[in-house]
Amino acid sequence: MAKEFSRSQRVSQEMQKEIALILQREIKDPRVGMATVSGIELSRDLAYAKVFVTFLNVLTDNADPDTVKNGIKALQDASGYIRTLLGKAMRLRIVPELTFAYDNSLIEGMRMSNLVSNVIKNDVERQVNPGSDEEK
């Protein structure tokens, strides 16, 4: 009987849920803000985990560029505490060493969506006013 998912995939899914709960309930650092765990890459031996996070306060237009750096640094500083809480929440022989990385896929997706919307809007304007295209 074949397994649908490997053990590392199952552990990473459960770890993603647990870390998201820990960030939401336990981490009180204001530099972290509203952090969302978007994915986890786990090594085959389950000793290392790369946690990808997004910050919702970065999505606003008036966001400080250093917000991401400060948030990742705060999470790196709290990684030992997060790892301790993770060890209590999950039954693993070895709790992985956590490293945090910023996941910009949400912002890139929004940028791509805006580009597509602008192209569609320009295309509709050109269809309505076919002669105005030559004036530009």
Swiss-Prot record:
Signal peptide: none annotated. Keywords: Cytoplasm, Ribosome biogenesis. One of its GO terms (cellular component) is cytosol. The keyword DNA damage does not apply. GO terms for biological process: maturation of SSU-rRNA; ribosome biogenesis. The keyword Cytoplasm applies. Its main location: cytoplasm. It is found in: Cytoplasm. Belongs to the RbfA family. One of several proteins that assist in the late maturation steps of the functional core of the 30S ribosomal subunit. Associates with free 30S ribosomal subunits (but not with 30S subunits that are part of 70S ribosomes or polysomes). Required for efficient processing of 16S rRNA. May interact with the 5'-terminal helix region of 16S rRNA. Monomer. Binds 30S ribosomal subunits, but not 50S ribosomal subunits or 70S ribosomes. This is Ribosome-binding factor A. It comes from Yersinia pestis.
